[in-house]
Structures are given as structure tokens and as C-alpha cells.
Amino acid sequence: MIQGTSSGSGKSTLVIALCRIFSDLGYKVSPFKAQNMTSNFHFVKQKKSLRRMAGIQAVQATAARIEPDIRMNPVLLRPLGDDLSEIILGGIGNLKLTAEDYYKSFVLQKGFPKVLQDLDSLRKENDLILIEGAGSPAEINLLNYDIANMILAERTNSKVLLVADIERGGCFAAIVGTIKLLPARQRKFVKGIIINKFLGQKSILNNAIVQVEEMTKRKVLGVIPKIPFDIPSEDSLDQKRAKSSYSKRYLDEQINIVASTFRKNTDMQYLLNILKMK
């Protein structure tokens, strides 16, 4: 499972990279995101109707060399403004709720059971599920409702990699703070750290990495450089074009760039050991 210290840390991109890497290694792999908020949709035809899932999960499916499946994104929230969202469950939207009502009467009662049902179904069909978290797992005001992060990791006994964006500053504080804010029973699921979007000589980070590893008791598996690539974003405010406007060949080339960069800058053997995969 890929979680981040914040929104925009690079979770989606890392899942894209890992989907392609594990597909290249011969594994049958599927992406999954329990809950996503976006207006960037991908439409899947199912039971003679079109159902909606987040566009970024469709890109991740492409990286895994499989067809997008509505089960990859059970809960989709489409922001409508004025604290109101359309709630799309299993690709079907027929409910509009405020954030307060969503957390009070929907997320645990209806959303999470659907998440577990779809995830269990996908697990039976794949060697590996790469779960993307949402935002930060340490939003302590939402810990009891955060089905996209540690509630799901705890329920499924998932191994978590924590990714932080160093470009925006405050990376090391965000890493340590995120891990320290997690309850002890959830903290144990974090198995490693990824520093993302780095520019410069990696050696300048050596002392800081040693200190972070000592404070968190977790290894920094990789420092991923910031590179130019062109892949659709999940952010509803992002202006990148939709997946449908990318040619298959071009998108595949961009996915390979991301995967190659991750592979070259990450301790892949350590990652495989975490997952108990050869």
C-alpha cells in the first residue's frame, strides 16, 4: 500500500510505476483505491450501462497491462461545491451528501463494506494488489473514518510505504510527524519510506536520511528524482488532459519512463523482501 505525507506527494505515480514493474516481473497485479475524490472519470461498460471510476485508476490498470475494472475504485466522490459531493458507489451515483453527512451516515455503514467486498474479489484474481491511499493517513480529526488509509491497511494487514514530496519543503518533518501521529497499532504497518521529486545530488540528503531512519526505525528505500513525464492526474483541479486523449503507445512510453526511474532509484530487493516476493 502506498500512503503519502500529503496530497500531491506522488502516490498515484508510484502505484503506476509499481504496477508496470511487477507486471514486467510476471506478476498478475491490480491497482486499487478505496476512496477517491475527483472529477476526472473513466467510464466502464458494465451490465449494459456506463459506470464511473477515477481516471487515474484506469491509467494504473494500463500500467498493469489489464483492463480498467470498476472494482478498482469502489467509492468515488465528485465535488459539487458548497461542501457537497456526489457519492458514486460501484460506479453508480445517486446520492449527494455534505462532508458531515458522508462521515456520519455513509462511509463506514455503506462505503467500507463495498470497499472490502471489491478488494476481496480482486485479491482472488491477482498475485498482488497495489493499494493507493488518499491524502495523508495522519489526519487525526478523521482517523476513525479514513477508510482509504490505515483503517484499510489494518483490516487487510497491508504493508505500507510512506511517500513524501521533498520539492515542496518540509519533507523530513512530514515523514517523522506522520509516523509519530499514527496510533501505535497502525504505525507498525509502515515498512519503509520513499522520498519523491528530488532535484540535485542525493549525497546532500545522506545525514538527514540517517537521522530520519533512526527516529522512525524505518528504512528510506529510495530517493526518486523529479523527471518530466506526461501522465493524466487524479487531481480534479489539475489541467492535464484526460486519459482518453492519450494514444496507447504514447501513454505506454510515459509509464515506462516512470517505472524505469523508480526502479533505478529504489532498493527493489528490500521492497521484494518486504512483500516476501522473490
Predicted regions and their residues:
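Flexible phosphate-sensing "switch/lid" loops adjacent to ATP/NTP-binding sites
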Residues: 1-278
